[in-house]
């Protein structure tokens, strides 16, 4: 596998990042009459990362601030050809490092994929704190709720 590097997202990276998110049914969508408050309506470029291999974007993730010391992760996705190669862990580590440097102490994550829930708990020390109903079909179409996880960054 090619060497993978993680860096901050640039505007020119958006089409590739959106393509990868779309592969997992996680692309942001604008508000509409049918879905006035979508799960994700955009990507905050200042808080977004990409993983790159051989000049090609192979993964993306971001986060947004909920308060001075609270943040929520947003849509980590990896090109299926690179799944299982550690790209997701590199992206997650980059965003957690940046959050720590910004003074974030508490991180919230929502996911609907059982393997991703296990990954967050076992690899990063998250704990499951509840569920939230989905606003519309996003990510897995047959799951109508998010599992909510939290991570105490001050303990790591």
Regions found by a protein language model. Give the residues of each.
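Conserved GNAT acetyl-CoA-binding A-motif
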Residues: 99-112
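Acetyl-CoA-dependent GNAT
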Residues: 8-12, 19-74, 79, 92
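Alpha-helical elements of the RecA-like P-loop NTPase motor core of helicases
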Residues: 15, 117-118
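Conserved N-terminal entry element of GNAT/NAT acetyltransferase domains
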Residues: 1-12, 153-156
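Conserved catalytic-core motifs of GNAT/GCN5-like acyltransferases
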Residues: 108-110, 121, 125-145
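Short, well-ordered beta-strand micro-motif
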Residues: 50-52, 148-152
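Conserved acetyl-CoA-binding loop-helix of GNAT-fold acetyltransferases
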Residues: 84-97
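Short hydrophobic/aromatic beta-strand or adjacent loop that forms the aromatic wall/cage
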Residues: 46, 143-149
């Amino acid at each position: 596998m090619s060497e993978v590097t993680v860096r901050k997202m640039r505007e020119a990276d958006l089409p590739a990042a959106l393509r990868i998110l779309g592969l997992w049914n996680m692309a942001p969508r604008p508000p509409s009459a049918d879905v006035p408050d979508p799960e994700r309506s955009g990507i905050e470029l200042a808080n977004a990362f990409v993983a790159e291999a051989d000049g090609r974007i192979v993964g993306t993730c971001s986060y947004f601030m909920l308060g001075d010391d609270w943040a929520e992760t947003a849509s980590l996705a990896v090109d299926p050809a690179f799944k299982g190669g550690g790209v997701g862990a590199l992206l997650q580590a980059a965003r957690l490092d940046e959050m720590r440097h910004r003074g974030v102490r508490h991180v919230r994550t929502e996911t609907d994929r059982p393997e991703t829930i296990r990954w967050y708990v076992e690899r990063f020390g998250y704990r499951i704190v509840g569920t939230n109903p989905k606003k519309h079909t996003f990510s897995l179409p047959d799951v109508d709720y998010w599992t909510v996880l939290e991570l105490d960054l001050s303990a790591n």
